[in-house]
């Protein structure tokens, strides 16, 4: 598949990677199509940051990140822009990823970040074939931070107190005797267990395994008049949290249920006229805790001390931390139990009609297509049980371990809460429309195709006109218009030339800058088809092709960060603003006139980002197809990247926020290598596999940095979203070393032996915020690696797939102790006078550390290698009992996803985009079967 059509693989001169349904269906029980792409397409990087049911779709980038704004690729399903989440894996025939200028130029202002083409299955002429797929998945969490139990954490606190007594003699009151410590780990009875809690929050909240399941039925076939493919798919993602019975009339927790249906029909209306009709729909319901309290449910794994309180006491009272009552909200068990439930419902209906007419009677090889597509999507959030205003009315208790005194917190009022355990003190969440995800789309296009062969000369051409209209909620529609063409020439399958162009318009910009022309060219040379090479009779050489492409593509969109500049080219005015009272002496609230102020300064010169891409590559196959692969070297220059006014180098006396502008520039480069092998050892044995490596590095060249800013503080010459840190260079091992060191500009008096020595990078004689420097890598890996090995023996099939990344950094702030909670993590060895080569400094208790003493402690090497997929299956296809039962084949399989992980990270999350803590990432074990009738 290529943009707006198909080409023979041998004649393709663009950088295109492809995978098929067989590969996608063995990805270990995942229901997210995005997750199934991991490791299966060179150049494609997927990053998952949560295992929450329904939210496991990863962030996808192609050949790195070349913009600090959107890096999301364009996704087309059967030629229409649609979200990947709307497609079930069992309905996919193939996925193609277009990466270079030649492959993406026809998408104009939408193609700079790459394009993913998803083609769904279609019917073939013949009797009906029915496939039934069913699988059950057992899930468990992959990796969470290794937190100390109460005994170890409090023992560490004792050590810290000893180290800081000179600063805080009163901290001695927190020092615990060995007898007291023993009670946390070995309580004598229930009363002691509640007075000296030692809660393993992971064991308390999470099941050993959770269950998910998926079922799919599809039928395909056809006659000379009509071919059909129809599919129905149901997926359920279960909750890894334990089931909670709260006697309040609702069932809290997390889950995700999705139904997908699809019908693809191909009609041969006449010998020269075809009609293609695609109908698909999905209904998905995601269940979670209500509202903003959701993140507190999993914060236990990153922040709640094991000795703080019991999740729930024996009398049914929830635990809270009385010395600081605001921490009552951090009882994750309570947050899960009595915060209500909220349902997010997504409904989608997609339709597209394509009429194809062969015009061979006018000119051989000429045909025309007309397409009309209507999509509707609706999202409702908030429906369910709203208990968020009443959770604090539950009874709370805390037992002081020092005295054994019980403290309770009960909130009542005189209106209707006669009992603090009022089980009906919640209301029904009515739900509301999410306008950002509720939309309607209409696309229509006309396309003319030509392909013909004259002896050794093969020529092709394509011209396409498309209009798109897209509206969110009740907003004014977005509109685009595209005029696209492609011309191809192939001489004797030896020399190939291609030229693409797109003239695109977008109403996101002013009328003067609304249209632009993007184009690309590509050439190919099939060396193995040269007469001289054939004369050499190189039996080991099957195919060798060189190809190169160069061109420009655009990327429109006016969303920067969380702000949408829909009409960024226009001035925006609004009324109100009390600041005018200080200027005029008139209170606007008492004035008979409306006060207006300019809240946005427009920039009529706004335009799309422009990507200039170069790709030089080779494709090869040796030894009768046993070994094949490709190598690509690529470069990109991204210009005109949007910079919001708040980040521009504009003096404060400008008077208002500066307008958004196209001022950014980023360069990137890298390479891809893929090697595949496929060897039929005997009639029964086949060995196969593939390995791939992608390296992509980006560097900001221009970000409107202030000219007088120090070079290391500028964004220029750094990676996109570069990590920064104060750099440590060992420890203060004695007071003499500390007294002779560089002072800190804040809390300098709190430095002590055992602290990191922080590098005075700017050499100004003081550690300040200016010593925060670029360090490590960005959050996007520079290198991704994939290795897959498998074999087939008669009906048996087995494979394993490893996936890894490196040259990536991730910040995880796992702070131990700190004066309020006894949370402590296993980080290795702590500094002491007798252990001066420790892994990390000793934490603090009451003595506040100086501002910069963390150094690089919480900036982790984000590299990892994981056993991503593995499968063992057996297919029955020739057994007599199979035919007697009316079956064509039966495949039974066991597979898994995210099975093993090797990393220095404290948890299994590939990015922090979902927040500091998140629902645990899952490990899956899947058992299923596939029946073909």
Q: What spans do the regions from the language model cover?
A:
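Extracytoplasmic gating/loop element in the C-terminal half of outer-membrane beta-barrel translocons
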Residues: 169, 173, 191, 317, ...
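Flexible loop and strand-edge segments within Gram-negative outer membrane beta-barrel domains
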Residues: 141-144, 193-233, 237-241, 252-330, ...
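Short, small/polar-rich motifs associated with maturation and membrane association
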Residues: 1-261, 275, 656, 685
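Extracellular/periplasmic, surface-exposed regions of secreted and cell-surface proteins
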Residues: 24-27, 72, 264, 268-269, ...
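Conserved small-residue
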Residues: 131-192, 291-292, 562-570, 678-779
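Short aromatic-centered micro-motifs
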Residues: 75, 761, 789-791
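Glycine-rich, aromatic-lined ligand/substrate-binding cores of catalytic
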Residues: 364, 778-811
